[in-house]
A protein has these predicted regions:
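Phosphate/diphosphate-binding glycine-rich loops and adjacent basic-rich segments that engage nucleotide
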Residues: 188
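Nucleotide/pyrophosphate-binding catalytic subdomain
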Residues: 1-185
Length: 188
């Protein structure tokens, strides 16, 4: 049973990231971590506002921000392997208990994933979970996540990105969105 766990980039700002990674290390695998872009993606937003470059360039830079977060996570937990090719995650995750996905621009382009701020690492995690035929997707956020909230409600509150429902609508896997505190209290 492969589980994709998306760790929001804001976990770095709240200092919860190391604890979340440690909790994942104690969980039974196989697990694939999808990193949010965190402060690296925020710098892309700031730069786009200043320099007015297009959304395609911004989207690609945000994917690079996710790659930077993958490197950061690997530095904190060297026993977690980084894997770039999404196609190899399904089989590789059975050899290595925890993998960190470092998304590749070309692979996302080949999958016809549109460039824009409405598609963030939330939607990319949903896409990846479907692509590798995961059994579960867990999205861990710093924000408060109301119990029983629908995806649409979470999108309207800005907790999930605007495209998430599109990517998750045909999911053949369980999806859970939770706050970091709930994740840590149930997974460490």
């Amino acid at each position: 049973m492969t589980c994709v766990i998306k760790l929001g980039g804001s976990l770095l700002e709240t200092a919860a990231l190391p604890a979340c990674l440690a909790a994942i290390a104690n969980r039974a695998g196989p697990i694939v971590i999808v990193p949010g872009g965190g402060p690296f993606a925020e710098q892309v937003r700031i730069a786009q506002g200043q320099w007015l470059f297009d959304d395609v360039a911004a989207h690609r830079m945000a994917v690079l921000a996710m790659q930077q977060m993958a490197l950061l996570m690997h530095s904190l937990m060297p026993e977690f392997a980084i894997v770039a090719d999404a196609a190899s995650l399904g089989g590789a995750s059975h050899v290595q208990p925890v993998l960190i996905w470092s998304p590749q621009i070309e692979q996302l382009d080949d999958a016809n994933i549109a460039a824009g701020w409405d598609i963030t690492s939330d939607s990319l995690a949903a896409w990846l979970a479907g692509f590798i035929q995961a059994d579960e997707l867990v999205i861990v956020k710093s924000a408060h996540v109301p119990e029983q909230a629908s995806w649409l409600d979470l999108q309207q509150r800005g907790i999930l990105d605007a495209a998430f429902q599109r990517f998750a609508a045909q999911a053949n896997y369980k999806i859970t969105v939770m706050n970091k505190d709930f994740f840590l209290s149930h997974h460490d």
